[in-house]
Amino acid sequence: MTSAPLAARLSIPSGPLFFPVTAYRPDGALNLDVYREHVRRGVEAGAAAVFACCGTGEFHALAPEEFERCVGAAVEETAGRVPVVAGAGYGTALAVRFARLAQDAGADGLLAMPPYLVVAGQEGLLRHYRELAAATSLETIVYQRDNAVFTPEAVVELARTDGIIGFKDGLGDLDLMQRVVSAVRTEVPGDFLYFNGLPTAELTGLAYRGIGITLYSSAVFCFAPEIALAFHKALNSGDDATVNRLLDGFYRPFVDLRAQGRGYAVSLVKAGVRLRGLDVGEVRPPLHEPTEDHVKQLAQLVDRGYALLQEGM
């Protein structure tokens, strides 16, 4: 756990937000040694924070005891250099259980993912996230996606809730997000944080930057940190020529490849980590592995991305 509050640590985008994959052995059991190495490499490469056991880390596939062990390993490997945020989800009771496990493991905060299965109204969603935020002392980021979509008025209420420090958007509705940002700025002045949480968030980085959202999750950082870091630096320094070169030559083709299979937002990333020499194992069901041809295309694309970096030097 870091000494400074999570909101303060995240408010300055010093690097990409790292969402490590969870490593498994051939028999499907956790491989904490490889997971530790994966986390350590990411921190040493320049990650601003580690988001452990979230979407890319297959939160949905982890038993509570596995979750606690992974979060604890991430905390130990970061050793306070960057904050560790852990996923928490499912129904309210289970989400609270995972939140308390994360706190016991030493995490700095929570990424609160959508409730499982149900489609709730705004009042029910607010009740869920308020109870989750009150269950621990961890600062909480609410993740908007799928069945958890909020009105601007509801996000204002989230921003007024003790313990909730930010809002991550995985929906991609920029009109809605502009209204959210404006409403919170008007009703709850302060330092409420916003995150671009779309898969391969770099693709929409310019658009989100236009409404003042510069924090984002980077799956590419898992397997091509130099590319992710170059993009992050360019985006935050206004070097749009480099941003567009990487978008056109690497990120857009990567998104096109990711769209070739369901669950590729996780399994293709995991394949990328294996391509770079770290055997993190396969994804757990119900996700499936990318095809051999798609892995070959990924390898070629990664080579192209690194070539683009050389061209820009």
Swiss-Prot record:
Protein name as annotated: Probable 5-dehydro-4-deoxyglucarate dehydratase 1
Keywords of this entry: Lyase
HAMAP family: KDGDH
EC number assigned by the record: 4.2.1.41
GO molecular function, one term: 4-hydroxy-tetrahydrodipicolinate synthase activity
Pathway: Carbohydrate acid metabolism; D-glucarate degradation; 2,5-dioxopentanoate from D-glucarate: step 2/2
Taxonomic classification: Bacteria, Bacillati, Actinomycetota, Actinomycetes, Kitasatosporales
Enzyme class: lyase
NCBIfam families for the chain: PRK03620.1 (NF002958)
Catalytic activity: 5-dehydro-4-deoxy-D-glucarate + H(+) = 2,5-dioxopentanoate + CO2 + H2O
Gene Ontology BP annotations: D-glucarate catabolic process
Domain of life: Bacteria
InterPro entries named among the record's database cross-references: Aldolase_TIM, DapA-like, Dehydro-deoxyglucarate_dehyd
Similarity comment text for this entry: Belongs to the DapA family.
Membrane-crossing residue ranges in chain numbering: none
SUPFAM superfamilies: Aldolase
